[in-house]
Amino acid sequence: MAAEPNSTPDGPLWVVIAAYNEERRLGETLKRLSPYCGNIVVVDDGSHDRTSEVALAHPVWVLRHVVNRGQGAALQTGIDFALRQGAGVIVTFDADGQHCPEEIAQLVEPIRAGRADVVLGSRFLGRAVGMPLSRRVVLRLGVLFTRVFSSVRVTDAHNGFRALSRRAALCIRITQDRMAHASEILDQIRLHRLRYCEVPVTVRYTEETLAKGQSSWNALKIVGQLLLGRLIR
């Protein structure tokens, strides 16, 4: 049994997973993750497959959206649930197995030590195994967009592996239902003057995860969603 990262005085560690049609990969992800955290909530975002059934076969909480609302909405549902359970630190973790649960301890350490409110995993400080050049270019453009519009200096703007203190989780409200939520979180870090840092993490790409990931066209749509959000704010 792996050692679970220490909780903060504010409460225990929780992991939130947003899952949509992940019956093939979710089981292995939960099997690898469980030794590193005893409090896991999976939010099935209106899947059409057996995602909920797979999750229920593991010692985790399972919530379900009746319709697919997008990853941002699913994460907010999970974060709200974890906060109600008394979470002191919340880690968001992808359902597809791209992230390494062994790295949770280093992700939460700056929060546990009182040095940060938000810790962002960076594949560009760590390793991006199997990442194609096209994906690297799109992600670098995302970093540039973030620096221009949010004034938050990061090396990896769209990594779903992050940790939030209880204070940060209570401050940040995800209103972008879909993938634009990652940039929105960075914007709210600046808005609420939250302390943040990055730590190196590993992201592993496979043909399957690349096929389900964000295309260049989707990246442009994310930019459009964020710009629209700024105009109507």
Question: Where do the protein language model's features map onto the residues?
Answer:
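N-proximal low-complexity "stem/linker" segments adjacent to membrane-targeting elements
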Residues: M1-K31
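Short hydrophobic beta-strand elements that form part
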Residues: W14-A18, V41, R64
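Acidic helix N-cap motif at the loop->helix transition within catalytic regions
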Residues: R24-E28, D49-A57
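Short, acidic, metal-binding catalytic loop of nucleotide-sugar glycosyltransferases
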Residues: T29-N39
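A conserved acidic beta->alpha catalytic loop
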Residues: D44-S52, G97
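Acceptor/aglycone-binding surface of glycosyltransferases and processive sugar-polymer synthases
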Residues: W61-R84, P101-M179, Y205-L228
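Short beta-strand-to-loop acidic/aromatic patch adjacent to the donor-nucleotide binding site
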Residues: A87-Q98
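Catalytic donor-sugar/metal-binding loop of nucleotide-sugar-dependent glycosyltransferases
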Residues: R153, I174-D177, L186-R204
